[in-house]
Amino acid sequence: MEPRRLSHELREGESDDLTRRRWIVGLSVLGSAIGGIVGLYQTGVVRRLPDPPSDLFDSSRVDASDYAYSRLQTPDGLLMIGTYAVTAALAGAGGKDRARDQPWLPIALAAKTVYDSFVALKLAQEEWRENEALCAYCQVATLASLVSAALAIPVAAEAVDNLLAERAGKSWAAVTQDRVERPLPTA
């Protein structure tokens, strides 16, 4: 796809898929920002992480613990920046018809967001087990991952349907005629 067309589709296009992708990009940027805040604390740029008033949260203690530095000898907040950036890039890649034209993109995005959700939940479990407290910032990022997965799965299912239809020899017109529209989740 030509860059000009991609730019137009991503910025001005209208579809349920693009709406979902925009939400995922926004949630991923939020996750990266949270990773940045935690990373600033973990590297000594800021001295303390304020928490909401609850005994469940002690972000400064959790993010200074052995747990927070146990992967790749790097503060985990800095790793969060990278992983959420990859998710944002996957959400932003491809045009508005990528479930048909590049089905591996929505499938990869769904796989990444589901994996991230499981990892975030596992890390929350580790946080609690080792510290008897949670990082409030990290739990917001966990929610962002869970919502991103919920948004990514319907389009990945459409992409899988398209791949299966292609293998079965159906034309795209037949697939779209038979396809049931997957509406956005409502609150």
For the regions a protein language model found, what residue spans apply to each?
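Short amphipathic, positively biased membrane-proximal segments
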Residues: 1-187
